[in-house]
């Protein structure tokens, strides 16, 4: 409400590190609160919040690799939504490491990067 954050669904290129790194990811959903990170090609620097939706056949190793990559880049919040198990894994950055919590699709989940935003998964059709 009244903030500068914007939501960008895939396809949307994110260059996680502002240096010469060639690491580019394409999260399912990126939330960016700093408009200075936006370019005509996508985003340069870590989004504030990334949501990935697990596709059947996706490797859990991919989730772990991205988890470490996103923590190193400074992504403040990372959610993995698994429609098959009906679980949401929420990782909230504390200093340089993620604090992890898990929820079901029957729960209301606080978005940690905002003071007053909750997502009620019971209300969503997934």
What are these regions (language model features)?
Residues 2-73, 80-126:
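C-terminal interaction segment
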């Amino acid at each position: 409400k009244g903030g500068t954050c914007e939501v960008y669904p895939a396809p949307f290129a994110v260059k996680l590190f502002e240096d010469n790194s060639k690491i580019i990811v394409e999260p399912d959903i990126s939330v960016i609160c700093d408009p200075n990170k936006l370019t005509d090609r996508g985003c340069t620097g870590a989004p504030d919040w990334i949501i990935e939706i697990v596709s059947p056949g996706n490797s859990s190793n991919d989730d772990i690799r991205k988890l470490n990559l996103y923590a190193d880049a400074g992504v403040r919040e990372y959610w993995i939504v698994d429609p098959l198990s009906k679980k949401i894994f929420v990782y909230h950055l504390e200093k340089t490491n993620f604090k992890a919590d898990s929820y079901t699709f029957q729960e209301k989940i606080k978005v940690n990067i905002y003071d007053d935003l909750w997502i009620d998964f019971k209300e969503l059709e997934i």
